[in-house]
């Protein structure tokens, strides 16, 4: 249907954050903290990152979220560079969650249902490659769950 899944994250890469203030204003968590042993992280691109981020706040077990750009060719691009389509970045939300409180399947359900993955490079009135549907993962266990959820949701779309 569409290319949405790439393993681009490493331990040294994450969504860029403001270098002077790391406290999440809504969740009151440090957005620069690395996941602890009972936590995991994933990055979702599902349209405008502000609206997408808000969807994940209401899920119990989500520790923190942060927004930024991923999947592009330039370090620390500006909003205008990303909107130009030249850098190849997507607007994304990094989600860190407690694996003992919420399963990745619940996060994937929110991902599929909080946007329309069938609209290529747009969400509603927002148009551009930065609004594409994408998932960045860190391990093969999550990769398998992501692909399984994609197949399940694709079957529903074809009914």
For each of these PLM feature ranges, what is it?
Residues 1-159:
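Flexible coil/turn and secondary-structure edge motifs
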């Amino acid at each position: 249907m569409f290319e949405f899944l790439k393993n681009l994250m490493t331990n040294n890469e994450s969504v860029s954050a403001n270098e002077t203030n790391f406290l999440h204003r809504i969740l009151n968590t440090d957005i620069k903290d690395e996941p602890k042993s009972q936590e995991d992280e994933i990055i979702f691109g599902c349209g405008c990152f502000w609206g997408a981020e808000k969807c994940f706040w209401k899920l119990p077990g989500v520790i923190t979220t942060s927004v930024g750009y991923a999947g592009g060719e330039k370090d620390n691009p500006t909003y205008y560079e990303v909107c130009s389509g030249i850098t190849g970045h997507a607007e994304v939300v990094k989600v860190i969650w407690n694996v003992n409180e919420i399963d990745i399947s619940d996060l994937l359900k929110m991902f599929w249902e909080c946007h329309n993955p069938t609209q290529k490079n747009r969400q509603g009135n927002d148009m551009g490659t930065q609004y594409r549907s994408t998932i960045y993962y860190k391990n093969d266990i999550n990769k398998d769950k992501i692909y399984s959820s994609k197949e399940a949701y694709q079957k529903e779309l074809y009914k």
